C-alpha cells in the first residue's frame, strides 16, 4: 500500500527513509560550489545578533535579497542578449534581419518587465522587514517578563516575607500589561503586513507572467513569418515582404501591454518615518506607446538610437532599426513603435536605497551595512 500524499511543506523537513542511510560522499573528489559556500556562511550569520523570535524571518529576508539580485542580473543580461541578437541579424538576409530586429525588441521589453518586477519585489521585502522588526521588538519584553518571574520565585523560595516581593510584583503587573500591548501589536501588524506582502508578491508574479506570455505570443507570430523551406543550390529565396506585418505585431503588443489590468488590488505604497512614500532601487515608469519619430531622418543608419533631447530622469531607449528596408523606407516614420523605459542612470543618487541597506544588518547589531549594488541599466549596441 502506497504512502499517503502530503499537502504541507512542514513534513518535508525530515529526510525521507531512502536518504537516511546513504553512503557517505567521497572524500577524494570534492567540487567547491562558491555560491553554496557563500550561503553556508551568510545565512547562519543572520541569527548571531538577531533575537530568537525574529531569526527565521530574518533568514527569509536575507534569502529574498539574494533572489532579488538574481532578478537584477537576469534583467540586465536579457537586455544585452536582445541587443546582440538584433546586432547579429543586421548583416543577414532581409527576412532574418527584420525578424531578429523585432524579436530583439520583444526580448528587450521582457528585460524591462523583469526590472519593473524588481521594484515591486523590493516592496514585498519591505513588508516582511516590518514583521521582522516588530518580532524583534517584542522579544525583549518577553525576556524581561520571564526574568522577573524567575526572580520572584527565587525570592519567595528563600524568604516568603521579603519586602522586595511587593515591589517586584508591582513591576510584574506593569510588565504583563506592556507584554499584552506588544503581543496585540505583533498579531495585528503581522497579519496586515503578511497579507500586503504576498498580495504584492503574487500580483507581481501574475503581472510579469501574463505580460511575458503576451510578448511571447507575438514573438511566435513574428517567427512564423520566416520561411525555412529548403532550397537547392542556385535557387533564389522568395522576396520577403513581412515588414508591415511585423511592425503591426509590435504595435499590437504595445497596445495589449498598456491595456492589461491586474486583477489584484494594489496595496497603498509604504511610507517611511517621515510619512513619505518608500523609494526603491529601481524607479521605473513603464510607458508603452506609439510616438512620432523626427530625429532619425538625417541620422546615419544604425541599429538602435537614443532619442535626442534633454534627459530628465533617465535614458529613453528606442529599439527601432533605421537600417535598410526598415521604417524609414516604408513610409511609416511618423508612427514608429517604441518602448520607453524610464531608468535611473548610474550617476544619479537615490536618497532611500532599499536594496542592501539596513534590512540585512542583523537586528540590534552595530555592524557595517553591506555595499550597495551598482545600477544595472544596459546600454544599446550601435551598429
UniProtKB/Swiss-Prot annotation:
Skewed-composition ranges (Polar residues): 325-336, 368-383
Species in which this protein is naturally found: Schizosaccharomyces pombe (strain 972 / ATCC 24843) (Fission yeast)
GO cellular component: eisosome filament; plasma membrane
Molecular function GO terms recorded: lipid binding
UniProt name for this protein: Probable sphingolipid long chain base-responsive protein pil2
GO terms of biological process kind: eisosome assembly; endocytosis
Keywords of the record: Phosphoprotein
Highest taxon listed in the record's lineage: Eukaryota
Compositional bias segments (type: Low complexity): 311-324
Modification after translation: Phosphorylated by ksg1 and ppk21. Phosphorylation is regulated by sphingolipid long chain bases (LCBs).
Region (Disordered): 292-336, 356-383
Record's keyword annotation contains Magnesium: no
InterPro entries to which the protein is assigned, alphabetical: AH/BAR_dom_sf (IPR027267), PIL1/LSP1 (IPR028245)
Amino acid at each position: 500500500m502506497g504512502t499517503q500524499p502530503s499537502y504541507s511543506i512542514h513534513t518535508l523537513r525530515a529526510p525521507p527513509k531512502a536518504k537516511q542511510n546513504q553512503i557517505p560522499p567521497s572524500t577524494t573528489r570534492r567540487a567547491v560550489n562558491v555560491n553554496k559556500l557563500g550561503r553556508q556562511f551568510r545565512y547562519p550569520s543572520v541569527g548571531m545578533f538577531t533575537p530568537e523570535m525574529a531569526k527565521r524571518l530574518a533568514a527569509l529576508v536575507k534569502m529574498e535579497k539574494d533572489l532579488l539580485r538574481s532578478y537584477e542580473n537576469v534583467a540586465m543580461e536579457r537586455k544585452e542578449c536582445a541587443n546582440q541578437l538584433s546586432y547579429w541579424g543586421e548583416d543577414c538576409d532581409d527576412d532574418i534581419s527584420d525578424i531578429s530586429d523585432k524579436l530583439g525588441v520583444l526580448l528587450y521589453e521582457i528585460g524591462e518587465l523583469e526590472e519593473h518586477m524588481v521594484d515591486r519585489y523590493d516592496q514585498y521585502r519591505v513588508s516582511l522587514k516590518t514583521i521582522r522588526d516588530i518580532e524583534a521588538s517584542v522579544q525583549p519584553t518577553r525576556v524581561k517578563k520571564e526574568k522577573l518571574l524567575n526572580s520572584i520565585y527565587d525570592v519567595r523560595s528563600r524568604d516568603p516575607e521579603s519586602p522586595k516581593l511587593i515591589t517586584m510584583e508591582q513591576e510584574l503587573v506593569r510588565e504583563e500589561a506592556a507584554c499584552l500591548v506588544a503581543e496585540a501589536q505583533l498579531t495585528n501588524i503581522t497579519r496586515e503586513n503578511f497579507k500586503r506582502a504576498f498580495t504584492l508578491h503574487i500580483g507581481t508574479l501574475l503581472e510579469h507572467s501574463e505580460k511575458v506570455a503576451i510578448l511571447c505570443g507575438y514573438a511566435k507570430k513574428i517567427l512564423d513569418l520566416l520561411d525555412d523551406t529548403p532550397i537547392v543550390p542556385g535557387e533564389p529565396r522568395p522576396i520577403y515582404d513581412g515588414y508591415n506585418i511585423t511592425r503591426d505585431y509590435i504595435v499590437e503588443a504595445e497596445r495589449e501591454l498598456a491595456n492589461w489590468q491586474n486583477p489584484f488590488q494594489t496595496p497603498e505604497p509604504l511610507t517611511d518615518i517621515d510619512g513619505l512614500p518608500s523609494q526603491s532601487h529601481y524607479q521605473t515608469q513603464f510607458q508603452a506607446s506609439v510616438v512620432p519619430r523626427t530625429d532619425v531622418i538625417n541620422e546615419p543608419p544604425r541599429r538602435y538610437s537614443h532619442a535626442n533631447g534633454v534627459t530628465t530622469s533617465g535614458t529613453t531607449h528606442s529599439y527601432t532599426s533605421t537600417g535598410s528596408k526598415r521604417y524609414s523606407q516604408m513610409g511609416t516614420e511618423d508612427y514608429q513603435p517604441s518602448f520607453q523605459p524610464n531608468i535611473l542612470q548610474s550617476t544619479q543618487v537615490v536618497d532611500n536605497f532599499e536594496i542592501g541597506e539596513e534590512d540585512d544588518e542583523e537586528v540590534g547589531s552595530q555592524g557595517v551595512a553591506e555595499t550597495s549594488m551598482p545600477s544595472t541599466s544596459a546600454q544599446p549596441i550601435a551598429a
